[in-house]
Amino acid sequence: MTELLIDGATTASTIDGCAAEAADFEAMQLNAAWTFEASHDPFLPLALAAKQTSSIELGTAIAVAFARNPMTCAVSAWDLQRLSNGRFILGLGTQIKPHITKRYSEPWSQPSSVRLRRRKSLDGPPLGALG
């Protein structure tokens, strides 16, 4: 029989509250705690949660890829992976046109081309920074 895994989504209005929810989820023996990009950065609560938990997986559902350059996103993900001892799950995603153009003040482009560039930056050869 397949094991049923149950995750929890953090909903607290503060990063401390989200980290505390992740600790509560672990105490309830949930499989993972997820943050999302709404009222705060999705990575910061997970950094706190990584220090307050020891077994639950921690992930972003989602971090908006368009709002970050690939290098800073990769470094944040790597740091969280190390801080959590391998429990971090990076969930990247796109947003709809109004969010991209209004909330982030970025030009709109077709998501497929941006996703391809993002995927190459994460799955391709090591990134290098010049300049």
Show which residues each predicted segment covers:
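Glycine-rich "substrate-gating" loop/helix at the edge of Rossmann-like oxidoreductase active sites
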Residues: 36, 63-69, 107
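N-terminal beta1-alpha1-beta2 module of alpha/beta enzyme domains
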Residues: 1-60
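Flexible, glycine-rich active-site loops centered on histidine and acidic residues
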Residues: 2-11, 70-131
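Alpha-helix-loop-beta-strand connector modules within alpha/beta enzyme cores
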Residues: 43-63, 67, 114-127
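Feature marks short, surface-exposed loop/turn motifs that line or immediately flank catalytic pockets
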Residues: 39, 66, 96-98
